[in-house]
Amino acid sequence: LYPISTGRNLAYGGSAPVHSGSVVLDLKRMNRVLEVDERNAYALVEPGVSYFDLYNYIQERGIDVWIDPPDPGWGSVIGNALDGGGGWTAYPYRDHFGAHCGMEVVLGDGDIVRTGMGAVPNAKTWQENKWGYGPWVDGLFRQGNMGVVTKMGFWLMPRPEAYISGTARVMNDEGAIGLMDTLNHLENLHIVNGSTQLGGGGGGAGFGGGAGWSLQVPIYGPPDVIRAQLAYARSKFEQIEGCTFTESEMIMTPAPGEEPPPGVRLVNFGIPDLSTFSMLGRSPFQPNPAGGHIGFSPILPRRGEELIRFRDWYQANASEVSGGENLGIVGPVFMTNWERSLVGLIMFPVSKDPAHNEKIRDAFVRWVELAAAEGWAEYRAPTVYQDLIARTYSFNDNALTRMREKIKDAVDPNGIISAGRYGVWPKHLRDA
């Protein structure tokens, strides 16, 4: 069995099983929102509930909380969290697995388990305390194949009153080191709580392009508070030599049932949509768009020196890896929306040309190998490369994978759930 729900896992292999011949278990019809508690700001949902579904449920009832949507609003709230996805509002809510609290799982042997406080009959705090008693097992089901998750709780964000942002700009790489150090300081103090965006750096190293670097820092909260937080952030960034800082107008957030302000990016206001997919659509500027892309997403230390080293490493190796051809690979784009680390995203286009796609596949494998040699590894992987990337987590003769296999054999003795997902195979298929 290979469980899926409403999401499509775009850029990471789609909804296809890892193991050929698997039976796809579609959970879309398990689509109930079981509870939304406004006073303690949490939801309990089934796997067929999409971000659109949960948003509409909240709006229709006038509940004054936000969800944290990723780019694909059609995606499953549970599925996105289990695959390690994230969103675009405030931390910690945009770390979707990190913001979950309690789950119900059907194991491979048919046993039904509730994690955390949910293991207590008639539990009153299942969605309010994630740890419960004894070893915490929820992580076994993130990118896992130990069972089928049938319910999951999530902490929601009380609607903040207002939103404001500032943008710090530097003109050289030395300034980027200061940007990262200052961002770390501000986020670790929870002064900047929104999903930041880094651009620039030259060589396609961000959405902004150009030789300099820019960093947008959004903040959510009460107007007087966030105005003071932004002023403090500005004072810190302006200590970087040559740094300029501009501020946006404050935006008051819409109450349930109100229209969002014009021109805003909806996902930054807890509103799911699909606008990001327009970049893949046909237009006068892009008459023959690619058929999609696959993402290479290594995790990097949140330091300016490492950001620059990754960019230079990519540029130094790009021609050799692509065989001297322009394969349309885009990157690196540096994502700063995970606290305490960076993602050095590289996007590989998928086309209707089999020969081109074969070159893309070869280039992807080579980038994985080169990155692993530098100590950089991915946090998420397209289906076809999950074994390859699992092998880069090889400390002590692959001890982590061996431990996962032992647990897999214990809770799914017949190996029937999602064989091979994220490099974990059941006993009867390990050497197949």
Where are the language model's segments positioned?
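C-terminal cap/substrate-recognition region of VAO/PCMH-type FAD-linked oxidoreductases
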Residues: V137, G153-F154, I164-G175, L179-L274
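Flexible loop/turn segments at secondary-structure boundaries
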Residues: N9-G13, Y51-D53, W74-S76, N122, ...
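Glycine-rich, charged/polar anion/phosphate-binding loops
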Residues: G87-P92, A123-K124, G132-F141, K151-G153, ...
